[in-house]
From Swiss-Prot:
GO cellular component entries: cytoplasm
GO molecular function annotations of the record: DNA-binding transcription factor activity; sequence-specific DNA binding
UniProt xrefs under NCBIfam families: PRK13503.1
GO biological process: positive regulation of DNA-templated transcription; rhamnose metabolic process
Coiled-coil spans in chain: none
PROSITE patterns, sorted: HTH_ARAC_FAMILY_1, HTH_ARAC_FAMILY_2
Record site: Interaction with sigma-70: E241, D250
Subunit note: Binds DNA as a dimer.
Protein name: HTH-type transcriptional activator RhaS
Record key words, sorted: Activator, Cytoplasm, DNA-binding, Repeat, Rhamnose metabolism, Transcription, Transcription regulation
Gene: rhaS
Lineage: Bacteria, Pseudomonadati, Pseudomonadota, Gammaproteobacteria, Enterobacterales
Role description: Activates expression of the rhaBAD and rhaT operons.
DNA-binding region ranges: 191-212, 239-262
Length: 278
């Protein structure tokens, strides 16, 4: 597995934060690093496999990667990221208690992926721009200024994430997409889902297409197929059982959609034939 080292990314041996844009981010094999990372998805779509679990990411996704996490990107489509790298909580001179602003693992579950709306994403861009222009002076005021900007970024993300709730259409769509991550295997009536999240059906279709480039049903199918591929690789369930577990009522239809999405059949994935090009 590829290991990325801080010496290759941080401007100096003492700098606690670095900005690393990926415009665009191509598919990238599984790796981990000796620093922490906040991944901000500007736009585009892709699959982020995080500690073996697949997530569909799009503009507004924010992922918190710790120094022991492993992850990779695949099936990227114009995926543009801004990575805010930071060494460790004890690398800062003026900041303490950062863990209170970061997602925390509880009972083995780590809420690594948050979502923010487009208005907040614009504020994030402005803060990142200030961080990039802050210079690399090591006198106390310069260091404090850079650390303050990093703290402002964490506060903005924390306040604006799904954890804090919101009422505008962007936030409602973010909540809907998070709901689909947990309920993808259920029969989905888009009219009922739109009503559940206080969106008109037309707004749901338009905004989901703007965020992901996919219609609602196409997005749901991709989500189901990604989850199915994970089960094919990491479980002993039959192809038919996996199809049903992931919301497909017909295993033949599932196999057709699967091959169309990944250019491999479910059986190919089960037998590891795709591993050669991973």
């Amino acid at each position: 597995m590829t290991v990325l080292h801080s010496v290759d990314f941080f401007p100096s041996g003492k700098a606690p934060v670095a900005i690393e844009p990926r415009l665009p981010q191509a598919a990238f094999p599984e790796h981990h690093h000796d620093f922490h990372e906040i991944v901000i998805v500007e736009h585009g779509t892709g699959i982020h496999v995080f500690n073996g679990q697949p997530y569909t990411i799009s503009g507004g996704t924010v992922c918190f990667v710790r120094d022991h996490d492993r992850h990779l990107y695949e099936h990227t489509d114009n995926l543009c990221l801004t990575n805010v790298l930071w060494r460790s909580p004890d690398a800062f001179q003026f900041l303490a208690g950062l863990d209170q602003l970061l997602p925390q693992e509880q009972d083995g579950y780590y809420p690594s992926h948050w979502r923010v709306n487009q208005s907040v994403l614009q504020q994030v861009r402005q803060l990142v721009g200030l961080m990039e222009r802050a210079g690399d002076g090591m006198d106390a005021p310069a260091v404090a200024n850079r650390e303050i900007l990093f703290m402002q970024l964490l506060v903005l993300l924390r306040r604006s994430s799904l954890m804090e709730g919101a009422t505008n259409n962007d936030a409602k769509l973010n909540q809907l997409m998070a709901w689909l991550e947990d309920h993808f295997a259920e029969e989905v009536c888009w009219e009922a889902v739109a009503e559940q999240f206080s969106l008109s059906l037309r707004t749901l279709h338009r905004q989901l297409k703007q965020h992901t480039g996919l219609t609602p049903q196409r997005y749901l199918n991709r989500l189901r197929l990604i989850k199915a591929r994970h089960l094919l690789r990491h479980s002993d369930h039959s192809v038919t059982e996996i199809a049903y577990r992931c919301g497909f009522g017909d295993s033949n239809h599932f196999s057709t959609l699967f091959r169309r999405e990944f250019n491999w059949s479910p059986r190919d994935i089960r037998q590891g034939r795709d591993a050669i090009i991973q």
